[in-house]
Amino acid sequence: MTEVVGFWESVSDDESEDKDCMEVQNTVSADESPLVQSLVSFVGSCSINLLLPFLNGMMLGFGELFAHELCWRFNWFNHRNKGYKVYPESRKIAALKEISSPGTRGRVASKFL
């Protein structure tokens, strides 16, 4: 006799008995206690929730560094882009004071701006 499993599948009695035996084998063994199983489940959950985001962040960070290095080496964007020149405000203010002081007379403090 056959039993209908799905829309297109049918399983004979022998195959269904084999499935039942396999299900019994996959159930809890007498050697493992529920505490051990719950501990293993908890560790697996923690590894997914804590380890994978860390690895994702590492890949994103190294990808950003790699992309920046490629852009710099192949000059895909102009090196004189002001986005590459990041200086502290104190250095900018000191450069502006140096330009406006009367002792400079034509000296340019462009390396700070």
UniProtKB/Swiss-Prot annotation:
Keywords associated with the record: Membrane, Mitochondrion, Mitochondrion outer membrane, Protein transport, Transmembrane, Transmembrane helix, Transport
Q: In a knockout, what does one observe?
A: Leads to reduced levels of TOM complex but retains the respiratory chain.
User: What are the subcellular locations of this protein?
Assistant: Mitochondrion outer membrane
Q: Name one GO cellular component term.
A: MIM complex
Q: Which residues cross the membrane?
A: 39-62
**Which InterPro entries does the entry link to?**
OMP_MIM1/TOM13_mt (IPR013262)
Q: Name one GO biological process term.
A: protein insertion into mitochondrial outer membrane
Q: What does this protein do?
A: Component of the MIM complex required for mitochondrial outer membrane protein import. The MIM complex cooperates with the receptor TOM70 in binding of precursor proteins and promotes their insertion and assembly into the outer membrane. Involved in import of the subset of proteins with multiple alpha-helical transmembrane segments, including UGO1. Required for the assembly of the TOM (translocase of outer membrane) receptor complex, which is responsible for the recognition and translocation of cytosolically synthesized mitochondrial preproteins.
UniProt xrefs under PANTHER family: MITOCHONDRIAL IMPORT PROTEIN 1
Tell me the protein family, please.
Belongs to the MIM1 family.
Q: How does it assemble?
A: Component of the MIM complex containing at least MIM1 and MIM2. Interacts with MIM2; interaction is direct. Interacts with TOM70.
Q: What is this protein called?
A: Mitochondrial import protein 1
Name the species this protein comes from: Saccharomyces cerevisiae (strain ATCC 204508 / S288c) (Baker's yeast)
